Amino acid sequence: MLWEPELAPTEALFQEAVEHVARKLGRAKEYPTAPLPDDRAAAVLALDTWAGSDVDWRGELRRYYEEHIPVRVRPGAAVNATLRRLHTSGVRLVWASPGPAEATEVLLHHLGVARLIDEVVIATSASGAASSLGLTDAVLVENGLDELLALAGEAAVPT
């Protein structure tokens, strides 16, 4: 179980994208003045509630990600190589993300790992994602590259 915020931090990009959505779509439907919750899953729910069927905030967020992700997130060679080795050896790779799914899909394609990931789960934590799938023996990679490399039996090489 791979936890997105540690392997590919996108919190700043998400915040920028939400600000863009508010500016652009707020002209079509008044955007609430109350700040969004800090928890991303709760923020996504609040955005869904605000948008209803009046505006497509998810589509606009996806477009923002597609345009801006190359500047904000760089693919990591060590992460990609390790995920390829794990995938080739038959390890089931589950990517857990705070969402939304549209942003996660763009991220995985940008990182070049979309085909290596067996399943994507939107959840508030890696352990929550594992529980939702009924994975009691899942190895959780929640603390970044070193933990991923340890899972693959490798050591980090300083660059």
Each predicted region: which residue ranges?
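Residues within well-ordered alpha helices
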Residues: V21, A46-L47, R85, L107, ...
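Asp-based, Mg2+/Mn2+-dependent phosphohydrolase catalytic module
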Residues: A101, E105-T159
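Short, acidic loop-to-helix structural element flanking the phosphoryl-transfer center
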Residues: E66-W95, A101-E105
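Short glycine/proline-centered loop/turn elements that form peptide/ligand docking sites
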Residues: S53-V55, N80-R85, L145-L148
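Anion (oxyanion) recognition and catalysis
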Residues: R23, H87, G153-A156
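N-terminal helical cap/lid subdomain that shapes the substrate entry/recognition surface
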Residues: M1-A77
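Short beta->alpha linker loops
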Residues: L13, R74-A78, G99-P100, S125, ...
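Small/polar loops that bind or transfer phosphate-bearing groups
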Residues: T10, W95-A96
